[in-house]
Curated annotation (Swiss-Prot):
Kelch repeats lie at residues 314-363, 365-407, 408-454, 456-502, 504-544, 546-592. Residues 66-133 form the BTB domain. Gene3D superfamilies: 1.25.40.420, Kelch-type beta propeller (2.120.10.80), Potassium Channel Kv1.1, Chain A (3.30.710.10). The gene is KLHL24. InterPro entries: BACK, BTB-kelch_protein, BTB/POZ_dom, BTB_POZ_KLHL24, Kelch-typ_b-propeller, Kelch_1, KLHL24_BACK, SKP1/BTB/POZ_sf. It comes from Homo sapiens. It is found in: Perikaryon; Cell projection, Axon; Cytoplasm; Cell junction, Desmosome. Residues 168-270 form the BACK domain. This is Kelch-like protein 24. GO terms for biological process: intermediate filament organization; proteasome-mediated ubiquitin-dependent protein catabolic process; protein autoubiquitination; protein ubiquitination. GO terms for molecular function: ubiquitin-like ligase-substrate adaptor activity.
Length: 600
């Protein structure tokens, strides 16, 4: 059309005029002749915008059409208001509203570097900028000020790619200052994974106390052994010993001193002059010594292994009865609450028995007695994954309970087929002997038994076939005597107890209630309800929480549910299912070495 129009104009310029009919043919088209291609959408693509930007940048260099001068640190940058406003909402607000800068030719900007402004303008006028380790920080801050999110994100991405043990803590602090949550998380995870290397660098020694604690308290800290954490903390303290000495006790509460190798503990920790001159640390040292003697009997946040060491706390379920209670199960299986994995261990010997007692001694597991009147005692060696027969009970029994107190195993009460037993026996694993100690004040079967604050507690139980007891009987090994304490709020048998943080928790007995007992203050309180009534359930403390596994419901059938109760929040949740419904089983927590090291 343009060519035709051009030809027509040329003809007129030559003095040749077309007739009206010819003009109609030139400018009018017969609709019947249209084929659907009467228009053409043309686009030069992104190159058009790039060419325009390039021309604007040339204009800027030659000060052509510039209408504002940005002054930073005394250096002037001629610019175009339209270009700045199109790229940055900061400048759009400055130039488009009735601000003083919208009328002035010279605009001064403080708080940034001239180099940063040069890089920023290069990006604005070209869409490109070279981000380096030297300019990334001020370029990030400048793009944040001018609200250029694309450039800001590019700087954050660049920092993420530069993570190294020598700089990750500094980048993390930078990310925290600028609310870069993704970068902050990546920095923290990187530092957790490479803690051994990170702790050797200057940035680590410059952490503040809270930042250091945030790392050393983490279960996800990746280390080969706990000694690395202790040494890192001591390096940090000795860096500014006069200022940091008062923080030593607080820091060591987050180091898992009980998990240090006994030789290292004696030869390195106990002889450290700073620790020796800090009486407030003595209790932590005492806890570690006790753990080396008593093992898992003494549980605290510091006895829980970090998963990266290859060890984890697992719940071991021993035997039990299947759904309708008519078949005894031979299985010994461990459950890892963190991964949700179940693994089979060596099967329980002579599993034809039922209603035996189970407890953990150090990192091994004992099973005693069983129906009918068994005197057998087996110990599971967790390192060798085998069951070994040890010295038999003096008196056969079932429906009894076992607990460990100060390194000794106590078998309490039970039933011999005719009478409830008041008999209590104590096992010394070093001499492999059982000895009788003071009997219960009230003979019971199926009570809850646990140790706490240096004493043994026997709660509830059945004094005969038809009644339940609400008595709480407390045994003191120093005096070899029993005392009655505050009664449990509801008389029950077939209940289970665990101790955590110097408190005793009781569940089961075909009630929904979970009760908590404070042995120091001698009082009970109701803390939570389960989702259904059950008895003869398993109960164990793992990773600082209480797990209730299986049990028998009101209809007599076993259940496969697993509940998790967190005393810190008083929240109870259903977390998983067992491999099969089970009741009358044993549940204990031990440390188990995993085939693979769990890392982030």
């Amino acid at each position: 059309m343009v060519l035709i129009l051009g030809r027509r104009l040329n003809r007129e310029d030559l003095g040749v005029r077309d007739s009206p009919a010819t003009k109609r043919k030139v400018f009018e088209m017969d609709p019947k002749s249209l084929t659907g291609h009467e228009f053409f959408d043309f686009s030069s693509g992104s190159s058009h915008a790039e060419n325009i930007l390039q021309i604007f940048n040339e204009f800027r260099d030659s000060r052509l059409f510039t209408d504002v001068i940005i002054c930073v640190e005394g250096k002037e940058f001629p610019c175009h208001r339209a270009v700045l406003s199109a790229c940055s909402s900061y400048f759009r607000a400055m130039f488009c509203n009735d601000h003083r800068e919208s009328r002035e030719m010279l605009v001064e900007i403080n708080g940034i570097l001239a180099e940063a402004m040069e890089c920023f303008l290069q990006y604005v006028y070209t869409g490109k900028v070279k981000i380096t380790t030297e300019n990334v920080q001020y370029l990030f801050e400048t793009s944040s000020l001018f609200q250029i999110s694309v450039l800001r994100d590019a700087c954050a991405k660049f920092l993420e790619e530069q993570l190294d043990p020598c700089n990750c803590l500094g980048i993390q602090r930078f990310a925290d200052t600028h609310s870069l949550k993704t970068l902050f998380t990546k920095c923290k995870n990187f530092a957790l994974q490479t803690f051994e290397d990170v702790s050797q660098h200057e940035e680590f020694l410059e952490l503040d106390k809270d930042e250091l604690i945030d790392y050393i308290c983490s279960d996800e800290l990746v280390i080969g052994k706990e000694e690395m954490v202790f040494e890192a903390v001591m390096r940090w303290v000795y860096r500014a010993v006069d200022l940091r000495r008062p923080l030593l006790h607080e820091l060591l509460t987050h180091v898992r001193l009980p998990l240090l190798h006994p030789n290292y503990f004696v030869q390195t920790v106990e002889v450290d002059q700073l620790i020796q001159n800090s009486p407030e640390c003595y209790q932590l040292l005492h806890e570690a010594r006790r753990y080396h003697i008593l093992g898992n009997e003494m549980m605290s946040p510091r006895t829980r292994p970090r998963r990266s060491t290859g060890y984890s706390e697992v719940i071991v379920v021993v035997g039990g009865c299947e759904r309708v209670g008519g078949f005894n199960l031979p299985y010994t299986e461990c459950y890892d609450p963190v991964t949700g994995e179940w693994k089979s261990l060596a099967k329980l010997p002579e599993f034809t028995k039922s209603e035996y007692a189970v407890c953990a001694l150090r990192n091994d597991i004992l099973v005693s007695g069983g129906r009918i009147n068994s005197r057998d005692v087996w110990i599971y060696n967790s390192q060798l994954n085998i069951w070994i027969r040890v010295a038999s009970l003096n008196k056969g029994r079932w429906r009894h309970k076992m607990a460990v107190l100060l390194g000794k195993v106590y078998v309490v009460g039970g039933y011999d087929g005719q009478n409830r037993l008041s008999s209590v026996e104590c096992y010394d694993s070093f001499s492999n002997r059982w000895t009788e100690v003071a009997p219960l004040k009230e003979a019971v079967s199926s009570p809850a038994v646990t140790s706490c604050v240096g004493k043994l507690f026997v709660i509830g139980g059945g004094p005969d076939d038809n009644t339940c007891s609400d008595k709480v009987q407390s045994y003191d090994p120093e005096t070899n005597s029993w005392l009655l304490r505050a009664a449990i709020p509801i008389a029950k048998r077939c209940i289970t107890a665990v101790s955590l943080n110097n408190l005793i928790y009781v569940a089961g007995g075909l009630t929904k209630a979970i009760y908590c007992y404070d042995p120091v203050e001698d009082y009970w309180m109701h803390v939570q309800n389960t989702f259904s009534r059950q008895e003869n359930c398993g109960m164990s403390v793992c990773n600082g929480k209480i797990y209730i596994l299986g049990g028998r419901r009101e209809n007599g059938e076993a259940t496969d549910t697993i509940l998790c109760y967190d005393p810190a929040t008083s929240i109870i949740t259903g977390v998983a299912a067992m491999p099969r419904p089970v009741s009358y089983h044993g549940c204990v927590t031990i440390h188990r070495y995993n085939e693979k090291c769990f890392k982030l």
